[in-house]
Protein backbone atom coordinates (compact mmCIF):
# COMPACT_ATOMS: atom_id res chain seq x y z
CA UNK A 1 0.00 0.00 0.00
CA UNK A 2 2.80 2.41 0.98
CA UNK A 3 4.64 1.80 -2.29
CA UNK A 4 1.50 2.66 -4.24
CA UNK A 5 1.11 5.87 -2.27
CA UNK A 6 4.71 6.90 -2.97
CA UNK A 7 4.38 6.04 -6.63
CA UNK A 8 1.30 8.20 -6.93
CA UNK A 9 2.98 10.98 -4.96
CA UNK A 10 6.04 10.99 -7.17
CA UNK A 11 3.90 11.03 -10.28
CA UNK A 12 1.90 13.98 -8.99
CA UNK A 13 5.07 15.82 -7.97
CA UNK A 14 6.61 15.25 -11.38
CA UNK A 15 3.70 17.04 -13.01
CA UNK A 16 3.23 19.66 -10.34
CA UNK A 17 6.87 20.80 -10.22
CA UNK A 18 6.56 22.02 -13.80
CA UNK A 19 4.10 24.63 -12.61
CA UNK A 20 5.80 25.16 -9.23
CA UNK A 21 3.12 23.67 -7.02
CA UNK A 22 4.62 20.62 -5.34
CA UNK A 23 3.46 19.57 -1.87
CA UNK A 24 5.55 17.17 0.26
CA UNK A 25 4.30 14.11 2.16
CA UNK A 26 4.92 13.11 5.78
CA UNK A 27 8.37 11.73 4.99
CA UNK A 28 9.38 14.92 3.20
CA UNK A 29 9.15 17.42 6.04
CA UNK A 30 12.52 18.85 5.11
CA UNK A 31 11.14 19.89 1.73
CA UNK A 32 8.02 21.62 3.03
CA UNK A 33 7.29 24.76 1.01
CA UNK A 34 7.28 28.23 2.54
CA UNK A 35 4.75 30.97 2.13
CA UNK A 36 5.96 33.99 0.25
CA UNK A 37 7.82 36.34 2.58
CA UNK A 38 9.57 39.67 2.00
CA UNK A 39 12.72 37.96 3.28
CA UNK A 40 12.45 34.17 3.60
CA UNK A 41 15.71 34.04 5.57
CA UNK A 42 14.56 36.42 8.33
CA UNK A 43 11.45 36.55 10.48
CA UNK A 44 9.24 39.59 11.01
CA UNK A 45 11.65 40.86 13.68
CA UNK A 46 14.66 40.59 11.40
CA UNK A 47 16.08 37.55 13.18
CA UNK A 48 17.67 34.87 10.99
CA UNK A 49 15.66 31.73 10.30
CA UNK A 50 16.03 28.68 8.10
CA UNK A 51 15.27 29.23 4.44
CA UNK A 52 15.31 26.77 1.55
CA UNK A 53 15.15 27.16 -2.25
CA UNK A 54 12.02 26.30 -4.20
CA UNK A 55 11.28 22.70 -5.06
CA UNK A 56 12.13 22.08 -8.73
CA UNK A 57 12.55 19.40 -11.32
CA UNK A 58 16.33 19.59 -11.40
CA UNK A 59 16.46 17.60 -14.64
CA UNK A 60 14.26 19.92 -16.67
CA UNK A 61 16.02 21.28 -19.74
CA UNK A 62 19.37 19.72 -18.87
CA UNK A 63 21.47 17.59 -21.19
CA UNK A 64 21.52 13.86 -20.59
CA UNK A 65 24.43 11.71 -21.72
CA UNK A 66 23.22 8.36 -23.01
CA UNK A 67 25.19 5.31 -24.06
CA UNK A 68 22.81 4.37 -26.89
CA UNK A 69 20.34 6.17 -29.15
CA UNK A 70 18.57 4.73 -32.16
CA UNK A 71 18.81 6.28 -35.63
CA UNK A 72 22.54 6.07 -36.36
CA UNK A 73 22.27 4.48 -38.85
CA UNK A 74 18.51 4.59 -39.47
CA UNK A 75 16.89 1.42 -38.13
CA UNK A 76 13.49 -0.19 -37.89
CA UNK A 77 11.74 -0.53 -34.55
CA UNK A 78 8.37 -1.98 -33.72
CA UNK A 79 5.78 -0.97 -31.15
CA UNK A 80 3.94 -3.86 -29.52
CA UNK A 81 0.30 -3.59 -28.52
CA UNK A 82 -2.16 -6.19 -27.31
CA UNK A 83 -5.71 -6.91 -28.38
CA UNK A 84 -6.97 -9.63 -26.11
CA UNK A 85 -4.42 -12.41 -26.31
CA UNK A 86 -3.17 -11.22 -29.68
CA UNK A 87 0.04 -9.17 -29.92
CA UNK A 88 0.24 -6.60 -32.69
CA UNK A 89 3.38 -4.94 -33.96
CA UNK A 90 3.48 -1.56 -35.66
CA UNK A 91 6.90 -0.89 -37.19
CA UNK A 92 8.53 2.52 -37.81
CA UNK A 93 11.86 4.01 -38.76
CA UNK A 94 14.18 5.72 -36.30
CA UNK A 95 16.36 8.22 -38.15
CA UNK A 96 18.46 10.70 -36.18
CA UNK A 97 18.89 12.97 -39.21
CA UNK A 98 15.13 13.43 -39.59
CA UNK A 99 13.63 15.53 -36.75
CA UNK A 100 10.25 13.88 -37.20
CA UNK A 101 11.70 10.40 -36.88
CA UNK A 102 14.47 11.08 -34.36
CA UNK A 103 14.40 10.11 -30.68
CA UNK A 104 17.28 12.14 -29.16
CA UNK A 105 18.24 12.38 -25.45
CA UNK A 106 16.84 15.93 -25.33
CA UNK A 107 13.36 14.37 -25.26
CA UNK A 108 14.11 13.01 -21.79
CA UNK A 109 14.07 16.41 -20.09
CA UNK A 110 11.90 18.57 -22.33
CA UNK A 111 8.41 19.71 -21.41
CA UNK A 112 6.37 16.58 -20.86
CA UNK A 113 3.06 16.93 -22.68
CA UNK A 114 0.84 13.84 -22.20
CA UNK A 115 -1.02 14.69 -25.41
CA UNK A 116 2.15 14.93 -27.47
CA UNK A 117 4.73 12.58 -26.00
CA UNK A 118 8.34 12.81 -27.12
CA UNK A 119 10.49 9.79 -26.35
CA UNK A 120 14.16 9.07 -26.24
CA UNK A 121 14.84 5.57 -27.54
CA UNK A 122 17.84 3.24 -27.42
CA UNK A 123 19.07 0.91 -30.11
CA UNK A 124 17.19 -2.38 -30.46
CA UNK A 125 17.76 -5.41 -28.27
CA UNK A 126 20.68 -4.34 -26.10
CA UNK A 127 20.10 -7.23 -23.76
CA UNK A 128 21.99 -8.29 -20.63
CA UNK A 129 24.97 -8.37 -20.09
CA UNK A 130 24.95 -5.19 -22.19
CA UNK A 131 23.29 -2.23 -20.55
CA UNK A 132 22.18 1.28 -21.46
CA UNK A 133 22.93 4.25 -19.22
CA UNK A 134 21.44 7.72 -18.83
CA UNK A 135 23.68 10.19 -17.00
CA UNK A 136 22.39 13.55 -15.81
CA UNK A 137 24.56 16.27 -14.27
CA UNK A 138 22.62 18.58 -11.95
CA UNK A 139 25.34 21.24 -11.98
CA UNK A 140 25.65 21.43 -8.18
CA UNK A 141 24.63 19.55 -5.08
CA UNK A 142 20.90 18.98 -4.74
CA UNK A 143 18.86 17.37 -2.00
CA UNK A 144 16.92 14.88 -4.07
CA UNK A 145 13.37 13.91 -3.12
CA UNK A 146 12.63 11.51 -5.95
CA UNK A 147 13.79 10.19 -9.31
CA UNK A 148 11.04 9.22 -11.75
CA UNK A 149 10.98 7.81 -15.28
CA UNK A 150 7.94 7.49 -17.52
CA UNK A 151 8.33 4.91 -20.29
CA UNK A 152 7.16 4.72 -23.87
CA UNK A 153 8.28 1.09 -23.94
CA UNK A 154 7.71 -1.65 -21.37
CA UNK A 155 9.60 -1.00 -18.14
CA UNK A 156 12.95 -2.80 -17.76
CA UNK A 157 13.10 -6.13 -16.01
CA UNK A 158 16.21 -4.94 -14.15
CA UNK A 159 17.35 -1.40 -13.62
CA UNK A 160 19.60 0.53 -11.20
CA UNK A 161 19.73 4.17 -10.11
CA UNK A 162 23.07 5.61 -8.96
CA UNK A 163 24.11 8.97 -7.57
CA UNK A 164 27.37 10.88 -7.45
CA UNK A 165 28.28 13.49 -4.86
CA UNK A 166 31.53 14.56 -6.54
CA UNK A 167 30.39 15.50 -10.04
CA UNK A 168 30.70 12.04 -11.55
CA UNK A 169 34.07 10.96 -10.19
CA UNK A 170 32.59 8.25 -8.00
CA UNK A 171 29.17 6.61 -7.93
CA UNK A 172 27.14 4.93 -5.22
CA UNK A 173 23.90 2.93 -5.64
CA UNK A 174 20.64 4.72 -4.92
CA UNK A 175 18.09 1.98 -5.75
CA UNK A 176 17.82 -1.35 -7.59
CA UNK A 177 14.80 -2.81 -9.39
CA UNK A 178 14.76 -6.45 -10.49
CA UNK A 179 12.78 -9.66 -10.31
CA UNK A 180 16.10 -11.39 -9.60
CA UNK A 181 17.91 -9.10 -7.14
CA UNK A 182 20.51 -11.63 -6.03
CA UNK A 183 21.42 -12.73 -9.55
CA UNK A 184 21.52 -9.27 -11.10
CA UNK A 185 22.90 -7.09 -8.30
CA UNK A 186 23.97 -9.50 -5.56
CA UNK A 187 21.46 -7.87 -3.23
CA UNK A 188 18.80 -9.46 -1.05
CA UNK A 189 15.22 -9.01 -2.16
CA UNK A 190 13.43 -6.26 -0.21
CA UNK A 191 15.94 -6.17 2.65
CA UNK A 192 14.54 -4.43 5.75
CA UNK A 193 15.72 -0.85 6.28
CA UNK A 194 16.96 0.00 9.78
CA UNK A 195 18.83 2.93 11.31
CA UNK A 196 22.01 0.95 10.80
CA UNK A 197 21.60 0.64 7.01
CA UNK A 198 19.27 3.49 6.06
CA UNK A 199 22.00 5.01 3.90
CA UNK A 200 22.20 1.89 1.70
CA UNK A 201 20.42 1.08 -1.55
CA UNK A 202 17.86 -1.71 -1.53
CA UNK A 203 16.59 -3.95 -4.30
CA UNK A 204 12.89 -4.44 -4.98
CA UNK A 205 10.72 -6.09 -7.63
CA UNK A 206 8.15 -3.30 -7.56
CA UNK A 207 7.74 -1.37 -10.83
CA UNK A 208 9.25 -4.29 -12.77
CA UNK A 209 6.07 -5.61 -14.41
CA UNK A 210 6.22 -5.68 -18.19
CA UNK A 211 2.77 -4.20 -18.42
CA UNK A 212 1.68 -1.62 -19.23
CA UNK A 213 3.52 -1.92 -22.53
CA UNK A 214 3.65 1.91 -22.69
CA UNK A 215 3.20 4.68 -20.16
CA UNK A 216 4.56 2.75 -17.18
CA UNK A 217 6.18 4.71 -14.32
CA UNK A 218 9.11 4.04 -12.04
CA UNK A 219 9.32 6.49 -9.12
CA UNK A 220 12.01 6.22 -6.45
CA UNK A 221 11.54 8.21 -3.24
CA UNK A 222 14.82 8.81 -1.45
CA UNK A 223 13.29 8.89 2.04
CA UNK A 224 10.55 6.27 1.72
CA UNK A 225 10.94 3.75 4.53
CA UNK A 226 14.00 5.42 6.05
CA UNK A 227 13.58 5.36 9.87
CA UNK A 228 15.11 8.81 10.48
CA UNK A 229 13.08 10.60 7.81
CA UNK A 230 10.78 12.13 10.45
CA UNK A 231 13.82 13.71 12.16
CA UNK A 232 15.73 14.71 9.05
CA UNK A 233 17.21 17.88 10.60
CA UNK A 234 19.08 15.78 13.13
CA UNK A 235 20.16 13.00 10.79
CA UNK A 236 23.48 13.77 9.04
CA UNK A 237 23.30 10.27 7.55
CA UNK A 238 20.09 11.00 5.63
CA UNK A 239 21.21 14.53 4.78
CA UNK A 240 24.16 12.92 3.06
CA UNK A 241 21.98 10.18 1.58
CA UNK A 242 19.71 12.57 -0.35
CA UNK A 243 22.62 14.71 -1.62
CA UNK A 244 23.66 14.30 -5.25
CA UNK A 245 25.41 16.23 -8.01
CA UNK A 246 24.71 13.65 -10.72
CA UNK A 247 22.15 10.91 -11.34
CA UNK A 248 22.74 7.81 -13.45
CA UNK A 249 20.12 5.30 -14.57
CA UNK A 250 21.41 1.94 -15.81
CA UNK A 251 18.98 -0.29 -17.73
CA UNK A 252 20.36 -3.80 -17.22
CA UNK A 253 17.84 -6.25 -18.74
CA UNK A 254 14.90 -5.95 -21.12
CA UNK A 255 11.51 -7.49 -20.57
CA UNK A 256 10.63 -9.84 -23.45
CA UNK A 257 7.83 -12.19 -24.41
CA UNK A 258 10.37 -14.96 -24.96
CA UNK A 259 10.01 -14.86 -28.74
CA UNK A 260 13.38 -13.28 -29.49
CA UNK A 261 14.84 -16.65 -30.48
CA UNK A 262 11.96 -17.89 -32.68
CA UNK A 263 11.97 -18.06 -36.46
CA UNK A 264 10.82 -14.49 -36.84
CA UNK A 265 13.21 -13.37 -34.12
CA UNK A 266 14.43 -10.36 -36.13
CA UNK A 267 10.98 -8.80 -36.00
CA UNK A 268 10.71 -9.71 -32.32
CA UNK A 269 14.09 -8.26 -31.45
CA UNK A 270 13.17 -5.01 -33.17
CA UNK A 271 10.37 -4.75 -30.62
CA UNK A 272 12.67 -4.76 -27.57
CA UNK A 273 14.39 -1.50 -26.63
CA UNK A 274 14.31 1.13 -23.91
CA UNK A 275 12.23 4.24 -24.51
CA UNK A 276 11.57 7.00 -21.97
CA UNK A 277 9.32 10.02 -22.39
CA UNK A 278 10.23 11.85 -19.20
CA UNK A 279 13.09 11.83 -16.69
CA UNK A 280 12.56 13.90 -13.57
CA UNK A 281 14.71 14.56 -10.51
CA UNK A 282 12.64 16.36 -7.91
CA UNK A 283 14.46 18.25 -5.19
CA UNK A 284 15.99 21.49 -4.02
CA UNK A 285 19.33 23.21 -4.36
CA UNK A 286 21.36 22.07 -1.36
CA UNK A 287 21.98 25.22 0.66
CA UNK A 288 21.87 23.78 4.17
CA UNK A 289 19.05 26.09 5.22
CA UNK A 290 21.04 29.26 4.56
CA UNK A 291 19.64 30.39 1.18
CA UNK A 292 16.24 30.84 -0.41
CA UNK A 293 17.41 30.54 -3.99
CA UNK A 294 20.20 29.44 -6.30
CA UNK A 295 21.73 31.80 -8.86
CA UNK A 296 24.36 31.76 -11.58
CA UNK A 297 27.78 33.11 -10.63
CA UNK A 298 30.32 34.80 -12.89
CA UNK A 299 31.41 31.42 -14.25
CA UNK A 300 27.77 30.57 -15.02
CA UNK A 301 27.86 27.91 -12.31
CA UNK A 302 24.79 27.31 -10.19
CA UNK A 303 25.44 28.37 -6.58
CA UNK A 304 23.38 29.20 -3.52
CA UNK A 305 22.62 32.86 -2.83
CA UNK A 306 23.94 32.50 0.71
CA UNK A 307 22.61 34.34 3.74
CA UNK A 308 23.28 34.14 7.48
CA UNK A 309 26.94 35.13 6.88
CA UNK A 310 27.67 31.84 5.11
CA UNK A 311 29.57 31.16 1.89
CA UNK A 312 30.37 28.40 -0.56
CA UNK A 313 28.39 26.76 -3.38
CA UNK A 314 26.18 25.07 -0.76
CA UNK A 315 26.53 27.73 1.99
CA UNK A 316 28.59 25.04 3.67
CA UNK A 317 31.07 27.29 5.45
CA UNK A 318 31.19 30.62 7.21
CA UNK A 319 32.21 33.61 5.17
CA UNK A 320 35.53 35.28 6.07
CA UNK A 321 35.76 36.92 9.49
CA UNK A 322 32.63 35.13 10.74
CA UNK A 323 34.32 32.38 12.70
CA UNK A 324 33.16 33.10 16.25
CA UNK A 325 31.33 29.78 16.29
CA UNK A 326 31.51 26.71 14.04
CA UNK A 327 29.43 26.43 10.90
CA UNK A 328 26.21 24.45 11.29
CA UNK A 329 23.29 23.56 9.09
CA UNK A 330 20.14 25.56 9.79
CA UNK A 331 17.22 23.74 11.37
CA UNK A 332 13.57 24.54 11.94
CA UNK A 333 14.46 25.65 15.47
CA UNK A 334 17.79 27.41 14.95
CA UNK A 335 19.12 29.37 11.99
CA UNK A 336 22.68 28.69 13.21
CA UNK A 337 23.93 31.77 11.42
CA UNK A 338 27.67 32.42 11.37
CA UNK A 339 28.78 35.12 13.81
CA UNK A 340 31.46 37.74 13.17
CA UNK A 341 34.55 37.70 15.36
CA UNK A 342 34.67 40.45 17.96
CA UNK A 343 37.86 42.32 17.08
CA UNK A 344 36.72 45.82 18.05
CA UNK A 345 37.28 47.02 14.46
CA UNK A 346 41.03 46.46 14.73
CA UNK A 347 41.42 43.25 12.64
CA UNK A 348 40.28 41.96 9.27
CA UNK A 349 41.02 38.28 9.82
CA UNK A 350 40.32 35.77 12.54
CA UNK A 351 40.28 32.03 13.12
CA UNK A 352 38.18 29.59 15.12
CA UNK A 353 39.51 27.83 18.22
CA UNK A 354 37.44 24.88 19.43
CA UNK A 355 39.04 24.80 22.89
CA UNK A 356 38.12 28.43 23.57
CA UNK A 357 34.65 27.77 22.19
CA UNK A 358 34.11 24.92 24.65
CA UNK A 359 35.52 26.94 27.55
CA UNK A 360 33.07 29.76 26.77
CA UNK A 361 30.11 27.42 27.07
CA UNK A 362 29.91 27.09 23.28
CA UNK A 363 29.31 30.78 22.79
CA UNK A 364 32.50 32.25 21.32
CA UNK A 365 35.61 30.74 19.75
CA UNK A 366 36.94 33.46 17.47
CA UNK A 367 40.56 34.58 17.74
CA UNK A 368 41.54 37.81 15.97
CA UNK A 369 44.63 37.79 13.76
CA UNK A 370 47.05 40.64 13.06
CA UNK A 371 45.48 43.24 15.34
CA UNK A 372 46.03 46.77 14.04
CA UNK A 373 46.11 50.25 15.60
CA UNK A 374 48.60 49.11 18.28
CA UNK A 375 46.12 46.68 19.88
CA UNK A 376 46.61 43.08 20.97
CA UNK A 377 44.74 40.18 22.52
CA UNK A 378 42.22 37.60 21.36
CA UNK A 379 39.68 40.35 20.64
CA UNK A 380 42.20 43.18 19.99
CA UNK A 381 40.80 44.48 23.28
CA UNK A 382 43.91 45.87 24.95
CA UNK A 383 46.95 47.87 23.91
CA UNK A 384 50.12 46.13 22.84
CA UNK A 385 53.41 46.52 24.69
CA UNK A 386 54.63 50.11 24.60
CA UNK A 387 51.10 51.58 24.38
CA UNK A 388 48.31 52.38 26.85
CA UNK A 389 44.57 53.04 26.64
CA UNK A 390 43.30 56.51 25.96
CA UNK A 391 40.26 56.32 28.22
CA UNK A 392 38.71 59.27 26.44
CA UNK A 393 38.14 57.13 23.34
CA UNK A 394 36.20 53.85 22.95
CA UNK A 395 38.22 50.69 22.38
CA UNK A 396 36.87 50.58 18.82
CA UNK A 397 38.53 53.92 17.98
CA UNK A 398 41.55 53.83 15.69
CA UNK A 399 43.52 55.88 18.23
CA UNK A 400 42.33 54.12 21.37
CA UNK A 401 45.95 53.25 22.19
CA UNK A 402 48.59 55.91 22.82
CA UNK A 403 52.34 55.41 22.82
CA UNK A 404 53.96 55.18 26.26
CA UNK A 405 56.97 57.28 25.13
CA UNK A 406 58.96 56.16 28.17
CA UNK A 407 62.22 58.10 28.52
CA UNK A 408 65.10 55.94 27.23
CA UNK A 409 67.31 56.80 30.26
CA UNK A 410 64.88 57.60 33.05
CA UNK A 411 62.55 54.62 32.55
CA UNK A 412 63.31 51.07 33.65
CA UNK A 413 61.52 49.65 30.59
CA UNK A 414 59.46 50.50 27.53
CA UNK A 415 56.14 49.25 28.86
CA UNK A 416 53.77 51.36 30.88
CA UNK A 417 50.62 50.94 32.91
CA UNK A 418 47.80 49.99 30.49
CA UNK A 419 45.35 52.28 32.27
CA UNK A 420 47.35 55.32 33.43
CA UNK A 421 50.26 55.28 30.99
CA UNK A 422 52.75 55.57 33.86
CA UNK A 423 56.20 54.31 32.85
CA UNK A 424 58.30 52.33 35.37
CA UNK A 425 60.86 54.86 36.61
CA UNK A 426 64.34 54.26 37.96
CA UNK A 427 65.18 55.28 41.53
CA UNK A 428 64.94 59.03 41.96
CA UNK A 429 63.16 59.56 38.63
CA UNK A 430 59.56 60.75 38.32
CA UNK A 431 57.05 61.91 35.72
CA UNK A 432 54.57 59.88 33.65
CA UNK A 433 57.30 59.22 31.09
CA UNK A 434 60.15 59.24 33.70
CA UNK A 435 61.65 62.38 32.23
CA UNK A 436 62.73 64.32 35.36
CA UNK A 437 64.34 63.82 38.75
CA UNK A 438 62.18 63.51 41.82
CA UNK A 439 62.30 65.99 44.70
CA UNK A 440 65.49 65.57 46.67
CA UNK A 441 67.36 64.13 43.68
CA UNK A 442 69.64 65.69 41.11
CA UNK A 443 70.66 64.64 37.64
CA UNK A 444 73.83 62.64 37.17
CA UNK A 445 75.79 61.68 34.10
CA UNK A 446 75.17 57.98 34.66
CA UNK A 447 72.60 56.29 32.37
CA UNK A 448 72.23 53.59 35.02
CA UNK A 449 71.34 56.00 37.82
CA UNK A 450 70.34 59.20 36.05
CA UNK A 451 69.06 60.79 39.26
CA UNK A 452 70.95 60.64 42.58
CA UNK A 453 70.10 61.94 46.01
CA UNK A 454 71.31 65.43 46.80
CA UNK A 455 73.82 64.83 49.63
CA UNK A 456 73.60 66.79 52.87
CA UNK A 457 77.18 68.04 53.08
CA UNK A 458 78.91 68.54 56.43
CA UNK A 459 80.20 72.10 57.12
CA UNK A 460 83.70 71.38 55.81
CA UNK A 461 84.82 67.76 55.59
CA UNK A 462 83.99 64.56 57.30
CA UNK A 463 86.97 65.20 59.55
CA UNK A 464 85.25 68.23 61.08
CA UNK A 465 83.09 65.93 63.16
CA UNK A 466 86.12 64.42 64.75
CA UNK A 467 88.96 66.10 66.57
CA UNK A 468 92.34 65.73 64.99
CA UNK A 469 94.47 63.29 67.01
CA UNK A 470 97.60 64.64 68.68
CA UNK A 471 99.82 62.09 66.95
CA UNK A 472 98.41 62.85 63.48
CA UNK A 473 101.75 64.11 62.17
CA UNK A 474 103.46 60.90 63.23
CA UNK A 475 100.60 58.77 61.84
CA UNK A 476 100.56 60.24 58.33
CA UNK A 477 101.55 63.37 56.53
CA UNK A 478 98.66 65.11 54.81
CA UNK A 479 99.40 66.52 51.42
CA UNK A 480 99.59 70.29 51.38
CA UNK A 481 100.24 70.92 47.75
CA UNK A 482 99.56 69.54 44.34
CA UNK A 483 99.85 65.79 44.11
CA UNK A 484 101.43 64.29 41.06
CA UNK A 485 100.59 60.94 39.46
CA UNK A 486 103.02 58.95 37.38
CA UNK A 487 103.27 55.45 35.93
CA UNK A 488 105.15 54.18 38.97
CA UNK A 489 102.39 55.26 41.36
CA UNK A 490 99.73 53.84 39.03
CA UNK A 491 101.41 50.44 38.91
CA UNK A 492 101.83 50.20 42.70
CA UNK A 493 98.11 50.54 43.35
CA UNK A 494 95.50 47.80 42.99
CA UNK A 495 92.79 50.03 41.61
CA UNK A 496 92.38 53.43 39.94
CA UNK A 497 88.93 55.01 39.57
CA UNK A 498 87.25 58.35 39.00
CA UNK A 499 84.70 58.95 41.76
CA UNK A 500 82.06 61.52 42.63
CA UNK A 501 81.48 61.87 46.39
CA UNK A 502 77.72 61.96 47.01
CA UNK A 503 77.37 61.78 50.79
CA UNK A 504 79.16 60.71 53.98
CA UNK A 505 77.85 58.75 56.97
CA UNK A 506 79.58 57.78 60.24
CA UNK A 507 79.59 54.04 60.88
CA UNK A 508 81.46 53.17 64.08
CA UNK A 509 85.21 53.34 63.46
CA UNK A 510 84.58 53.97 59.77
CA UNK A 511 83.25 56.63 57.51
CA UNK A 512 81.03 55.35 54.74
CA UNK A 513 81.04 57.50 51.61
CA UNK A 514 78.40 56.92 48.95
CA UNK A 515 80.24 57.52 45.71
CA UNK A 516 79.35 57.27 42.06
CA UNK A 517 82.14 55.51 40.17
CA UNK A 518 82.27 57.31 36.85
CA UNK A 519 85.24 55.53 35.23
CA UNK A 520 87.36 52.47 36.11
CA UNK A 521 90.97 52.62 34.89
CA UNK A 522 92.34 49.74 36.95
CA UNK A 523 90.66 47.20 39.18
CA UNK A 524 93.07 44.33 39.79
CA UNK A 525 91.34 41.59 41.75
CA UNK A 526 88.66 43.97 43.01
CA UNK A 527 85.21 43.72 41.44
CA UNK A 528 84.74 47.40 40.82
CA UNK A 529 81.90 48.44 38.48
CA UNK A 530 80.59 51.77 37.32
CA UNK A 531 77.67 53.19 39.29
CA UNK A 532 76.96 53.81 42.95
CA UNK A 533 79.19 52.05 45.50
CA UNK A 534 80.42 52.49 49.06
CA UNK A 535 83.87 53.92 49.86
CA UNK A 536 85.10 53.02 53.35
CA UNK A 537 87.79 55.09 55.15
CA UNK A 538 88.79 54.66 58.77
CA UNK A 539 87.81 57.51 61.07
CA UNK A 540 91.43 58.05 62.12
CA UNK A 541 92.50 58.52 58.47
CA UNK A 542 89.73 61.05 57.93
CA UNK A 543 90.62 62.90 61.11
CA UNK A 544 94.24 63.15 59.98
CA UNK A 545 93.06 64.16 56.51
CA UNK A 546 94.74 61.13 55.01
CA UNK A 547 93.16 61.23 52.57
CA UNK A 548 91.47 64.59 52.44
CA UNK A 549 88.13 64.46 50.61
CA UNK A 550 84.99 66.57 50.48
CA UNK A 551 81.40 65.65 49.49
CA UNK A 552 80.10 66.71 46.08
CA UNK A 553 83.62 66.75 44.69
CA UNK A 554 85.16 64.51 42.04
CA UNK A 555 88.48 62.74 42.62
CA UNK A 556 90.90 60.36 41.02
CA UNK A 557 91.37 57.61 43.62
CA UNK A 558 94.22 55.08 43.57
CA UNK A 559 94.31 52.52 46.36
CA UNK A 560 95.04 48.96 47.39
CA UNK A 561 92.55 46.11 47.73
CA UNK A 562 91.36 45.61 51.29
CA UNK A 563 88.28 44.00 52.83
CA UNK A 564 85.50 46.48 53.46
CA UNK A 565 82.93 46.26 56.25
CA UNK A 566 80.09 45.46 53.82
CA UNK A 567 82.12 43.21 51.48
CA UNK A 568 80.83 45.14 48.49
CA UNK A 569 82.57 48.48 48.70
CA UNK A 570 86.14 49.69 48.26
CA UNK A 571 88.57 50.81 50.97
CA UNK A 572 90.95 53.78 51.02
CA UNK A 573 93.52 54.47 53.69
CA UNK A 574 96.42 56.79 54.36
CA UNK A 575 98.39 55.08 51.60
CA UNK A 576 95.70 55.82 49.01
CA UNK A 577 96.31 58.55 46.50
CA UNK A 578 93.38 60.98 46.23
CA UNK A 579 93.70 63.76 43.65
CA UNK A 580 90.98 66.27 42.88
CA UNK A 581 89.70 65.49 39.42
CA UNK A 582 90.73 67.39 36.35
CA UNK A 583 89.65 66.46 32.84
CA UNK A 584 93.30 65.99 31.83
CA UNK A 585 93.49 62.99 34.20
CA UNK A 586 91.24 60.98 31.91
CA UNK A 587 93.71 61.00 29.04
CA UNK A 588 96.67 60.21 31.31
CA UNK A 589 94.82 57.40 33.12
CA UNK A 590 93.87 55.78 29.79
CA UNK A 591 97.52 56.01 28.71
CA UNK A 592 98.64 54.24 31.91
CA UNK A 593 95.94 51.66 31.36
CA UNK A 594 97.24 50.85 27.87
CA UNK A 595 100.83 50.60 29.13
CA UNK A 596 99.73 48.20 31.84
CA UNK A 597 98.13 45.94 29.24
CA UNK A 598 101.49 45.86 27.41
CA UNK A 599 103.25 44.71 30.60
CA UNK A 600 104.95 48.01 31.47
CA UNK A 601 103.89 47.79 35.12
CA UNK A 602 106.16 44.77 35.70
CA UNK A 603 109.15 46.77 34.46
CA UNK A 604 108.16 49.74 36.60
Swiss-Prot record:
Glycan-modified residues: 95, 116, 131, 417
GO biological process: animal organ morphogenesis; anterior/posterior axon guidance; apoptotic process; axon guidance; axonogenesis; Cdc42 protein signal transduction; cell population proliferation; cell-cell adhesion
One Pfam short name: EGF_LMN_ATRN
Swiss-Prot/TrEMBL keywords: Apoptosis, Cytoplasm, Disulfide bond, Glycoprotein, Laminin EGF-like domain, Repeat, Secreted, Signal
Coiled coil location: none
Species this chain originates from: Rattus norvegicus
Gene3D superfamilies: 2.40.50.120, Galactose-binding domain-like, Laminin
Cross-referenced SUPFAM superfamilies: EGF/Laminin, Galactose-binding domain-like, TIMP-like
Laminin N-terminal domain mapped to chain residues: 47-284
Stated role: Netrins control guidance of CNS commissural axons and peripheral motor axons. Its association with either DCC or some UNC5 receptors will lead to axon attraction or repulsion, respectively. Binding to UNC5C might cause dissociation of UNC5C from polymerized TUBB3 in microtubules and thereby lead to increased microtubule dynamics and axon repulsion. Involved in dorsal root ganglion axon projection towards the spinal cord. It also serves as a survival factor via its association with its receptors which prevent the initiation of apoptosis.
GO terms under cellular component: basement membrane; cytoplasm; extracellular region; glutamatergic synapse; synapse
SMART domains cross-referenced by the UniProt entry: C345C, EGF_Lam, LamNT
Signal peptide positions (record): 1-24
Domain (Laminin EGF-like): residue spans on this chain: 285-340, 341-403, 404-453
InterPro entries cross-referenced by the UniProt entry: Galactose-bd-like_sf (IPR008979), Laminin/Netrin_ECM (IPR050440), Laminin_N (IPR008211), LE_dom (IPR002049), LMN_ATRN_NET-like_EGF (IPR056863), Netrin_domain (IPR001134), Netrin_module_non-TIMP (IPR018933), TIMP-like_OB-fold (IPR008993)
Name the UniProt record assigns to this protein: Netrin-1
Motif (Cell attachment site): 530-532
Domain of life according to the entry: Eukaryota
Gene name linked to the record: Ntn1
CDD domains: EGF_Lam (cd00055), NTR_netrin-1_like (cd03579)
Disulfide bonds: 119-152, 285-294, 287-304, 306-315, 318-338, 341-350, 343-368, 371-380, 383-401, 404-416, 406-423, 425-434, 437-451, 472-544, 491-601
Subunit and partners: Binds to its receptors; DCC, UNC5A, UNC5B, UNC5C and probably UNC5D. Binds to its receptor; DSCAM. Interacts with APP.
Main location per the UniProt record: secreted
UniProt domain NTR: residue ranges: 472-601
Amino acid sequence: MMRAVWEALAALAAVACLVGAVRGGPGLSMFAGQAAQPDPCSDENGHPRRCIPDFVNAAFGKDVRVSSTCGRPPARYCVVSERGEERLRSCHLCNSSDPKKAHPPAFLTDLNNPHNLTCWQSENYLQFPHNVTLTLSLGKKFEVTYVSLQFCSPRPESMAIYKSMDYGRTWVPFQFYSTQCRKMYNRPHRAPITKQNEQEAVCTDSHTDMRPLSGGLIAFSTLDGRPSAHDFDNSPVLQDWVTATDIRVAFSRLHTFGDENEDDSELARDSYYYAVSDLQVGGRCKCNGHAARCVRDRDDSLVCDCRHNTAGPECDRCKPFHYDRPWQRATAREANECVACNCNLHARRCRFNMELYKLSGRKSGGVCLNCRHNTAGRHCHYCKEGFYRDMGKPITHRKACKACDCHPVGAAGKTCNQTTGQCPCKDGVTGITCNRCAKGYQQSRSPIAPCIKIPVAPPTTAASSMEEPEDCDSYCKASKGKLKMNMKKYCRKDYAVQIHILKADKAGDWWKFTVNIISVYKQGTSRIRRGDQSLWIRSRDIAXKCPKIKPLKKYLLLGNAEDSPDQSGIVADKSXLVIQWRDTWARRXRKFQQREKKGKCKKA
